[in-house]
Amino acid sequence: MEAKAYLNMIRISPRKVRLVADTIRNKPVAAAIATLYNLDKRSAEPVLKLLNSAIANAVNNNGMDADKLFVKTIFVNEGPTLKRFRPRAHGRAYEILKRTSHVTIIVSDERI
């Protein structure tokens, strides 16, 4: 059985969030929590909260055992990009792209 959790519009670049997502993919949730807790990345905290939400969904909604769960799937998609302009010399302006991410995590109690 599976449980899902979503995190939308996180204001961190998808490329940076994917670094964290790759470290916890296919791990047991206890090992994934320990990894995220000790990881020195800005995106580790939101992904840790998302993982805890997925675990809570599995336990409360589906009645699964939290000790048997593992991270089956985690993927990061690109969200909408906020466009800002920075003034530059001689009346020019450069476009600054503020990228956002959508993160989806699926935990399961069935090993493949």
Curated annotation (Swiss-Prot):
- InterPro entries annotated for this entry? Ribosomal_uL22 (IPR001063), Ribosomal_uL22_bac/chlpt-type (IPR005727), Ribosomal_uL22_bac/org-type (IPR047867), Ribosomal_uL22_CS (IPR018260), Ribosomal_uL22_sf (IPR036394)
Keywords attached to this entry: Ribonucleoprotein, Ribosomal protein, RNA-binding, rRNA-binding
Return one GO MF term.
rRNA binding
Query: Where on the tree of life does the source sit, at the highest rank?
Result: Bacteria
- GO annotation, cellular component aspect: cytosolic large ribosomal subunit
Q: Which SUPFAM superfamilies match?
A: Ribosomal protein L22 (SSF54843)
Q: Show the Gene3D superfamilies listed in the entry.
A: Ribosomal protein L22/L17
Q: Does the keyword Iron apply?
A: no
Q: Has UniProt tagged this entry with the keyword Ribonucleoprotein?
A: yes
GO biological process terms, alphabetically, are: translation
Q: How does it assemble?
A: Part of the 50S ribosomal subunit.
> What family is reported?
Belongs to the universal ribosomal protein uL22 family.
Protein function? This protein binds specifically to 23S rRNA; its binding is stimulated by other ribosomal proteins, e.g. L4, L17, and L20. It is important during the early stages of 50S assembly. It makes multiple contacts with different domains of the 23S rRNA in the assembled 50S subunit and ribosome.
Task: Cite the HAMAP family for this sequence.
Answer: Ribosomal_uL22_B (MF_01331_B)
Q: What is this protein called?
A: Large ribosomal subunit protein uL22
